[in-house]
């Protein structure tokens, strides 16, 4: 169920402060965050935000199409290595 419109978007306060400070300083440095739950707002456009995936920070460049989504959607937490082909060595007849 999506978030109610009357509540507005949720952005962690510490992350929003970093974004506003970067906008005022006209800085394009990478902003490191652990806040995967924060929604992408228009103030973040053009910034690169390094989102933590549980092991390392994955850089995410914010574009217009990402507004309204959450940061965690762009940093997958699980690595898929593919399905195993038929293992004929382990099979007995």
Swiss-Prot record:
The record's listing under Gene3D superfamilies reads: 30s Ribosomal Protein S19, Chain A (3.30.860.10)
Q: Does the keyword Nucleotide-binding apply?
A: no
What's in the keyword line of the UniProt record? Ribonucleoprotein, Ribosomal protein, RNA-binding, rRNA-binding
Which Pfam families does its entry note? Answer: Ribosomal_S19
The record's listing under InterPro entries reads:
Ribosomal_uS19, Ribosomal_uS19_bac-type, Ribosomal_uS19_CS, Ribosomal_uS19_SF
Presence of keyword RNA-binding: yes
GO molecular-function terms, A-Z: rRNA binding; structural constituent of ribosome
What GO cellular-component annotations does this UniProt entry give?
A: cytoplasm; small ribosomal subunit
Listed under GO biological process in this entry are: ribosomal small subunit assembly; translation
Family per similarity comment: Belongs to the universal ribosomal protein uS19 family.
Please give the function described in this protein's UniProt entry: Protein S19 forms a complex with S13 that binds strongly to the 16S ribosomal RNA.
Quote the protein name from its UniProt record: Small ribosomal subunit protein uS19
| Protein source organism | Leifsonia xyli subsp. xyli (strain CTCB07)
> Which gene specifies this protein's sequence?
rpsS
């Amino acid at each position: 169920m999506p978030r109610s419109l009357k509540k507005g978007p949720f952005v962690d306060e510490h992350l929003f402060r970093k974004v506003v400070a970067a906008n005022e300083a006209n800085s394009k440095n990478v902003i490191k965050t652990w806040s995967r739950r924060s929604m992408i707002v228009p103030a973040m456009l053009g910034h690169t935000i390094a989102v933590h995936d549980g092991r390392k920070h994955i850089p995410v460049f914010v574009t217009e199409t990402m507004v309204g989504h959450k940061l965690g959607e762009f940093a997958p937490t699980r690595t898929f290595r593919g399905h195993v082909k038929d293992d004929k060595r382990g099979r007995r007849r």
